[in-house]
């Protein structure tokens, strides 16, 4: 009997890699290097406070400044998992890896990835919509070919005026990207967008890549299902009761600090699993997203619905 721990390690590596590559928000995981993470469900986010320039004195020299480096401990609030059974009569040891890989790959693609994307986008929208005087949000906009480019450019301008000169990324639903394409009649520039080691050709506006996202992931709030309560057995997520539809979101690439980690996957062979004559696969994933307080001005969201 092959070592099920080896199977688990293979799946963990492949599923983690697949998660980053297939997420529409996978570029946000590139910012996880900003935090300290040693496993488990806690991370430490650094913040730096610096004093500004002072006068240089020719006799006394430099005015002494201070640097304060602090770490804020955050807990990953998203602890999600599922257990699957593959009947022993459907597979044997020789084709278990191939079958289980297909099952877990499909689960990751169709259920895990959309939920993580929707969660991240909703949290970023919540932050942008929470800025005073709606400085980072626009409401009641119906997508229109004649105005969509100006609306996006205005969002970019707002972020730039807030002092964020780094690369911006535009997350847009497919109605928005279609309107953009029709507005420019094929004249839009395209470029390479790198994420998880994969290079993809995407359209650009003002040097900002546009990532197309399904509408079902573009909500200002979502409700997570626990997978066991009546009516929630299917698991996953749904649009929040008070959620609004997002047309597009603009965010500085370096702003969202996202972490997604799969806990050690557990695989039990039919000889070990006692409840049924089946292979048991236990999948668990920690994830969350954070934005530093001084980076809230680097997010802009355009909402289809009215504010009230």
Where do the language-model regions lie?
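Residue-level detector of alpha-helical recognition elements and their boundaries
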Residues: 60, 122-123, 127, 225, ...
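Short Gly/aromatic-enriched secondary-structure transition segments
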Residues: 58-65
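Extended, solvent-exposed, turn-rich assembly/linker loops in the middle of proteins
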Residues: 130-202
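Long, contiguous amphipathic alpha-helices that act as assembly "spine/axial" helices in icosahedral shell
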Residues: 45, 71-133, 147, 151, ...
């Amino acid at each position: 009997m092959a070592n099920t721990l080896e199977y688990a390690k293979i799946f963990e590596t492949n599923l983690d890699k697949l998660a980053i590559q297939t997420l529409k928000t996978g570029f946000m995981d590139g910012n996880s290097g900003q935090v300290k993470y040693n496993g488990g469900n806690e991370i430490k986010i650094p913040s730096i406070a610096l004093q500004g320039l002072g006068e240089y004195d020719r006799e006394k020299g430099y005015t002494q400044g201070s640097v304060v480096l602090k770490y804020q401990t955050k807990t990953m609030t998203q602890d999600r998992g599922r257990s699957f059974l593959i009947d022993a009569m459907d597979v044997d040891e020789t084709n278990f890896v191939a079958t289980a890989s297909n099952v877990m790959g499909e689960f990751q693609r169709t259920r895990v990835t959309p939920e993580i994307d929707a969660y991240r986008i909703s949290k970023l929208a919540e932050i942008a919509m929470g800025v005073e005087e709606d400085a980072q949000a626009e409401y009641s906009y119906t997508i229109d070919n004649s105005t969509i480019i100006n609306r996006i450019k205005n969002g970019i301008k707002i972020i730039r005026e807030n002092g964020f000169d780094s690369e911006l990324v535009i997350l847009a639903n497919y109605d928005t990207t279609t309107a953009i394409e029709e507005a420019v009649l094929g004249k839009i520039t395209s470029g390479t967008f790198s994420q998880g080691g994969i290079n993809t050709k995407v359209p650009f506006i003002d040097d900002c890549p546009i990532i197309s996202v399904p509408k079902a992931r573009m909500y200002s709030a979502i409700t997570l299902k626990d997978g066991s309560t009546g009516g929630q057995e299917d698991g996953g997520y749904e649009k929040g009761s008070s959620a609004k539809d997002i047309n597009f979101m603009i965010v500085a690439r370096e702003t969202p600090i996202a972490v997604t980690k799969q806990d050690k996957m557990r695989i039990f062979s039919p000889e070990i699993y006692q409840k049924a004559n089946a292979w048991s696969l236990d999948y668990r994933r920690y994830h969350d997203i954070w934005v530093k307080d001084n980076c809230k001005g680097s997010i802009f969201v355009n909402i289809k619905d009215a504010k009230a």
